[in-house]
């Protein structure tokens, strides 16, 4: 007899779901080819969009076949999981620094964002337009269209970290606190616009907390000798200020990430150093947490999550195609219940499959096999 047959669990009708996804999917070869042609001026934007629309429609159909409850557009219109959103705001420029982001054994493409004016939301933001198309594909179905965006704190850190960033800020802002306020407001306005377009399921992707949790890396984010605690207070405020006075039927969750690029990682360390801030105080309904390797630490920080909030355990890696041992995952879920109620736990892969257009090193078949395993295990545990 399975655990689901002996216990009664809350029926999930909104995110997070017992078997869930983080959101990005491997880009099809057709889409990659179209993006390359667009970059080389061989096709125009309308032709690229037609390919994007076709690939997103096919992806939504595959997600429906996988019996996912909340579906995404796979982030197929983005090059990066975060920068495209930043570039969509007024007052933020696309820059090409000397170096990309440094991951374990690999350096990314060199793209970034920099202040070039007062930061404001505008009604033509690409994430808003992308969501409208996704919703059109789910209208008349039971599928919930989910929009993922990088967290406000992630945007702020991108704008303040790096050579020449402080000078750019000083041209338009009297202080970084003023900048932070505008970032939160721009995000708040984007979120409300998404809501007006029909979004009821929003996920914030956030690598800032994964970086601050790393004992060897957090100081990179600290400004002017700032302590780890003050840094966390600052970033928590930026995120929470964007989430004030939102409609009650908008479900907001967050994915606390350690970096995901071409199957490599950026930071390491358990969630303990940041648990008292992000896990205890961020105004979201659920936390998608990475627990696919020893780098993630133990489950003890889950005790800081308020009892009424959900934790999605990212126990299956999205960085490789090898399937996890089923019993190992079942045992780890049981271990997590020492710190958070089983009824408030769900299961997913640790991250998306393609945080950037390069994608992780696995096949599409392996990607869907991972999701199928997540679903199968969740059904055994919760009867999902």
Where do the PLM segments sit?
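Domain-level signal for soluble alpha/beta catalytic cores
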Residues: 2-384
């Amino acid at each position: 007899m399975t655990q689901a047959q002996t216990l009664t669990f809350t029926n999930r009708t909104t995110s997070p779901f017992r078997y869930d996804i983080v959101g990005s999917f491997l880009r099809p070869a057709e889409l990659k080819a179209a993006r390359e042609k667009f970059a080389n001026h061989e096709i125009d934007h309308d032709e690229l969009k037609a390919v994007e629309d076709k690939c997103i429609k096919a992806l939504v159909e595959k997600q429906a076949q996988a019996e996912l409850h909340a579906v995404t557009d796979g982030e197929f219109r983005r090059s990066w999981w975060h920068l495209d959103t930043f570039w969509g705001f007024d007052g933020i420029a696309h820059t090409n620094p000397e170096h990309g982001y440094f991951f374990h054994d690999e350096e990314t493409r060199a793209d970034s964002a920099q202040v070039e004016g007062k930061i404001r939301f505008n009604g033509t933001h690409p994430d808003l337009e992308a969501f409208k198309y996704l919703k059109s594909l789910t209208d008349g179905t039971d599928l919930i269209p989910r929009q993922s965006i990088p967290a406000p704190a992630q945007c702020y850190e991108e704008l303040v970290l790096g050579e020449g960033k402080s000078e750019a800020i000083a041209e338009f802002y009297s202080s970084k606190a003023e900048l932070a306020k505008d970032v939160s407001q721009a995000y708040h306005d984007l979120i409300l616009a998404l809501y007006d377009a029909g979004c009821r399921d929003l996920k914030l992707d956030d690598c800032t907390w994964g970086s601050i949790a790393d004992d060897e890396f957090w100081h990179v984010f600290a400004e002017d000798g700032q302590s780890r605690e003050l840094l966390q207070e600052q970033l928590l405020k930026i995120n929470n200020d964007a989430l004030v006075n939102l409609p009650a039927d908008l479900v907001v969750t967050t994915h606390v990430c350690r970096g995901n690029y071409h199957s490599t990682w950026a930071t390491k360390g358990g969630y303990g150093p940041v648990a008292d801030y992000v896990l205890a105080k961020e105004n979201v309904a659920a936390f998608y947490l990475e627990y696919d390797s020893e780098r993630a630490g133990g489950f003890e920080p889950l005790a800081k999550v308020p009892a009424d909030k959900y934790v999605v355990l990212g126990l299956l890696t999205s960085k490789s195609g090898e399937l996890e041992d089923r019993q190992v995952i079942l045992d780890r879920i049981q271990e997590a219940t020492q710190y958070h109620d089983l009824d408030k736990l769900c299961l997913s892969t640790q991250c998306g499959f393609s945080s950037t257009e390069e994608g992780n090193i696995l096949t599409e078949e392996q990607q869907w096999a991972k999701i199928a395993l997540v679903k199968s295990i969740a059904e055994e545990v919760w009867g999902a």
